[in-house]
Amino acid sequence: MSTRTFLEVEAKFAVVDTAVVPDLTRLAGVEAIASTKTHRMSAIYYDTTDLRLTRSRITLRRREGGDDDGWHLKLPAVAGRLEVHADLGEPVDGLYQVPEEILSQVRALVRREELQPIAQVDNERVESVLADAEGRPLAEFCDDHVSAWSLLPGGSPSSGREWEIELAGDTPGTEQGENILHSATQLFISAGARVSSSPAKLVMALGDSAHQAPLPPFLVDADVDPDSPAAAVVAALKLNRDKLHEYDPKVRRDEWDSVHQMRVATRELRSHMETFNGILGGEELEYIESELKLLASMLGYARDAEVVEERFLRLLDSEDSDVLDETTRGHLREDMGTEYRRAHRRVIATLNSDRYLDLLDAIDSLLADPPVVGAHAAGPGTPEKVDEADDTEQPAADLPAGDEAEAGEPVAEVAPEEEAAETVAPQPQTAEEVEAILSEHLEEAYQRLMKRHRKAVENWENPELTLHQREDYFHDMRKSAKKLRYAAEAVGAATSLKTKRLYNACKQMQSSLGDFQDFRFARCSSRQWFVSDCGIHGRLVHRLKRRDRGFGNISHF
């Protein structure tokens, strides 16, 4: 079953039953009412028993009537809401099943929980299409008379009237669209309406019955001293966990830069666990760190393929001679995208696996009941051992469809004498003591970066090392810079310590070294693909046949 995705930008207003719709041609840019229709619609809304979709500002409904029968999933977006539509499909044993294409978009939240009806909303809608002077649709105005029922325990019926204006055509995200919504707000309020306190009809339908539902695991607050270092660490981990939830559906939709951002969130989450080792600890933490490393590896494989493709395409576009015709260029672009598409399919298989869902459950459990070490907050624990653990992201053999993927991030081994025993300090009570403990962990992260910096610089011209080994030292340095950057952000958010300059400096260093690493990976990958018989070089030879000049021109990539 296919889906359709678009951005919904609208404004809602509550009105009394006797309110009169004002002259809609008074809205900015509106010259005519192109058409008016009446629809009778009925929608069933679905969620888990703990309302994890509703609490995340996500609505899922199956609606009949109107011009868009089917399943509608609405997700938060930067401007407005992202709508995903799917056809109704055929019922199974008399019941309609949520399409997999829709369910996959919320799997990171729903996981193994059953989606069940939570409300019914019936709506008699008078819909008017508002057009400009050329007849182009600008917006749709809906006059809705709503009857709703909560299907939750303690639910009751409700009813009301609502005006809704939704931008249409090319107006969402434009200044013209903003002007339409602004003028609509002024016009409707002057006609007796008020901005709706319910952003969705579902909220009105559920009413007070929503408060009786249990909290989902990711909303359970940890029972820790709010002034302790543990509370600061948990707050930082929650932000990263929420980013995983945010980018999961974006990766599934293959939105631009989503793989990269989900990988960053995964690494930052794990980095915090390692940097603040000694404040939190235990086997569950170690399990999560290990699983996050595997997830980052799968995402890294796709990200690396994406980087190589982007760099190659830029080089291809800069080749402005007539040696390569458009057909050949098209073949090369297709070839370069194949590796990323293959890697992305492996990522999706990973996100659909039980192992990934187990990881999400484990993270929620840890944040709800954090394993504070010995009921204390400690000073730095085993920095070198922890730091080196982040340097290889090797996927496990039982990860679905991606067991051969490797992140390609080697690192030098750690001498046993570098490992330090974990220490435990009494639970602090003052802000100064909290800052002292967190700053100690920050200092350890800084010293790890300095050690790697010295190692990279001192060995850059070492004739006993290969170029690959010398470059690895700079890559290790970059990873330490990222750890320090993440730690600086977390400590700055939790204390009065001024870490912004440190954060920005680490970000700049990470960016420069990241460009170096991307170029390095692209260089190695391109060389491998070009020289292989089944790679680009071999396919290019086959396609160009006797065009030796063209082949020679391409080979410099």
Which residue stretches match the model-derived regions?
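Cationic, histidine-enriched alpha-helical/coil surfaces that engage anionic ligands
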Residues: M1-F557
